[in-house]
A protein has these predicted regions:
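Noncatalytic alpha-helical scaffold of FAD-dependent oxidoreductases
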Residues: 1-183
Length: 183
């Protein structure tokens, strides 16, 4: 859905001198000067204390479908992402792990996944829309030479795909004594 900066429509801020200001509005774009909403969000509290936020909200999608696929090269994996975006597919999540990361995941989780660049994908929307986009995506994946493709058929399989993806941080940390997590 984008970054927090994209989701904040307006806010109320208390400036260091005590003045209270309100930013934003209903207009998507404005030529009325600086975009104070984005300025304050980007400052992460250094320019003033944010006391209220008006956020853009999204409803729960009717349907969600997860998949993961491996490719012989990063170029093939990224070409698939570029193609999917060009087609305007309803992708909610796209994450990429390279071969080094997949090796670390295998060692950390005692799995036997393909140790090549791997995409973790989630499509969301209406059931017919997701089914259509998934068919298009499967074609793009094949066109770009996927080595392996797994489409989640059950909630358990969906959970497995995202559990694998979320193990990447811990796999990386356990792969080296000197590793550190930066955020």
């Amino acid at each position: 859905y984008g970054s927090m900066r994209d989701l904040v429509l307006g806010l109320t801020v208390v400036l260091p001198d005590g003045e209270v200001i309100r930013t934003g509005g209903r207009a998507r774009k404005s030529a009325a000067g600086y975009d104070l909403t984005r300025l304050f969000i980007g400052s992460e509290g250094t320019l003033g204390v944010i006391t209220e936020l008006t956020l853009r909200l999204f409803g729960q999608p009717e349907c969600a479908q997860s998949a993961m696929c491996s490719f012989a090269s990063m170029q093939a994996a990224t070409a698939t992402v570029v193609d999917a975006l060009r087609y305007g597919l309803c992708l909610n999540r796209i994450e990429l792990a390279d071969s080094v990361q997949m090796n670390a995941i295998n060692r950390h989780t005692q799995s036997e996944l393909v140790e090549k660049p791997t995409l973790f994908l989630e499509l969301t929307g209406s059931k017919p829309g997701v089914e259509h986009d998934l068919a298009v995506l499967e074609g793009l994946i094949q066109d770009n030479g996927a080595l392996a493709f797994e489409r989640a058929q059950t909630q358990e399989q969906t959970n497995r795909i995202w559990r694998i993806r979320h193990s990447a941080l811990y796999a990386s940390r356990s792969s080296s004594v000197r590793s550190r997590t930066l955020s």
